[in-house]
Amino acid sequence: YRRQRQMCIRDSRDIFFNEAVFCADSGMIVETGEESYETAPGETVVFNPDTEDFNEGRIKLIPKSGEIQFQSVNRGIGTPSYGGTIEVSLYDEGIVVVNEVGIEDYLKKVVPSEMPSGFNLEALKCQAVCARSYAYTELSNNYYSAYGAHIDDSIQFQVYNNSPRAESTDTAVDETAGQVLSYNGEVVKTYYYSTSCGSTTDVTLWGNTTENYPYFVAECVGGVDRGLTLTVESEFNTFIKGENEADYDYDCTLYRWSMEESVKEISEGFARSTGKNVGNIKDIEVLERVNGGAAVKVKVTGDKGETVIDSESAIRAAFGNANVDMNTKSGTTRYANLPSTFCVFEKVTEGKKLTGFKITGGGYGHGIGMSQNAANKMAESMTYAQILEFFYRGTT
């Protein structure tokens, strides 16, 4: 499983640039149409919509050795450098920059951007196999086909070249070279997320069926199964308000979290994020939980009406608040969105007066597939193959 990847490089908003500035320490070859020229080592090349070379169509940049710096973007690593080749094209909306690179080199800049390079090697190997599998399922993606690319370099697909390469993540990619996860002979889309609450869920969270994705199973992550039916509100309430030291994510910051919002804060935040004004919120009721306990349908009643929020992403956006402290296992923080929908909502009262709501939850992310923090804990005593089999049942 070795192929080339073509990805659009994004700025903070989209894939279009008003100006694109490149530099290579070794110099580079610039191909325009049937002609080409070379730049001196360290020489800067600037493209804007008036650049005459665009008259010949797509412009290709090839480093003489090493990589090319793209000075028009800023990443966690500062100014990023790209291996492989770079293609620069002009469209009505602006300049589009596409990086073409071999998949193994691509992964060496994805894995440290998606998982801390200080994690245990077996966990990093899991991430490498997951990232490679995910990348192959996206080869058929036509999202950016109009621009000569499969994907972009953002969280919408997989984060690429945002954190520095590390020896540990390079080793993880090399030691799993070419390996992907398959189910019945087909490469699977390996969803993963940061932290579990002690329970995973399955694709019913996103309205799909388990028949289509049988390798995603809602199950206990490490601890003893407490025999609770987590789709039942009262039993999930018991689960999320308890902790289990045997859970692989137990020591993680967002294994459990809670926040308290006043009626004013939660009502204004809800109206702002959903565009639905129900007035002052009087009641929040979870109408449906999927396997594993994640909420997918929440009824909100206010003094001006009621509405139902019916998707995981919408629920997380509707009740998060960047202006309110969230209590975690390692202090307080703030989030614009809820970390997950593995949560319960409770009224806060003074006497008989409703003053606010407390949200108690666990985990960070959607909860489908592999918990990265759990994988790191499991890697202390398990191989990457064993960890992957745990999170992606029946895959090889």
Which residue ranges define each predicted feature?
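Conserved, single-site charged/polar hotspot
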Residues: 2-6, 10-396
